Amino acid sequence: GINLPPAYHYDEDKLATVLRPLKDSIYKDPVDALFTFENNRVTAFKPSENGQTINIDQIKETLLNRTIRANPKALPANSTITIPVVSLEPKITTEKVNNLGIKELIGTGTSLFQHSIENRVYNVTLASSRLNGILVSPGETFSVVKALGDISSLTGYKQAYVISGGKTVLGDGGGVCQVSTTLFRAALNAGLPIVERNPHAYRVGYYEEDSPPGIDAAIYSPSVDLKIKNDTGHSILIQSYINPDELRLTFNIYGTSDGRQVDIGTPVITSQTPAPETLYQDDPTLPKGQLKQVDFAAAGARVYFTRTVKKDNKVIIADTFTSNYRPWQAIYLRGTKEN
């Protein structure tokens, strides 16, 4: 008789059934870039993202070489292969939609403002929206106070607690320091030079909900400012985002990475001072016996942290940020008005 060698092959349908869940779990659509520039402000931006999928043909070829072609009579029961993942390029890349150097995320900062009163939440939302989409040119020093402009009821702000004249009082725009604090954190992480930064007079609980003490930045127009320099050689884009469920503010800074590496040290508390005893002040406008808290206790502390920025293994920025927080007294108004 004629001795014909057997012809081995895979059942294509069964192989496709096996590989389909694997492909579905790995597949990711590419994302086209979005960049809209109107009235000197970026109104919409999304960087392009590569997608990914698996190379089915390469998997089949590997299986053939590892099994049927190698030893058709002894297919291994347990065998592993590396899944070849290939990149899918978007049709519209970030480089195609702008020539300003806005390519990638170079720094991000976050903060929580849970337990804020309604007006404070409103002010944080308003102020952060007014910084959203700002472009900072190469070599430019960005001023938060200048960018926000007038902070008052005339520009849409509501009354919430501010630090003024050594007291915590209701004032227009209470909460805007949440915005400057969060942008400060983003600039720190981006490795940008901090030209001016001022701590708060006392430790504010909002800024320590998800952060150690000392990483805050106060602003108070016109003299207390946060200033950041763009030394990257390309434009940078500031974007803000609020998660309404978590009451979390995020600032993202986009630009062109030049490979700088940032190391931020853990804040160190070198001394602490207990808060003064609670003060009660008689108030004839409040019903007798009623208490109203108008200032909140906070221990004093001296805090510092360092930041080192390296590029090509050389230190290009070395800062120390120091905060001297005063001990703060809780104050209650005590009603004396007779019915």
Language-model features and meaning:
Residues 2-6, 47, 164-167:
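Short coil/turn segments at secondary-structure junctions
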Residues 17, 21, 27-29, 36-38, ...:
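Well-ordered beta-sheet/strand-loop patches within structured domains
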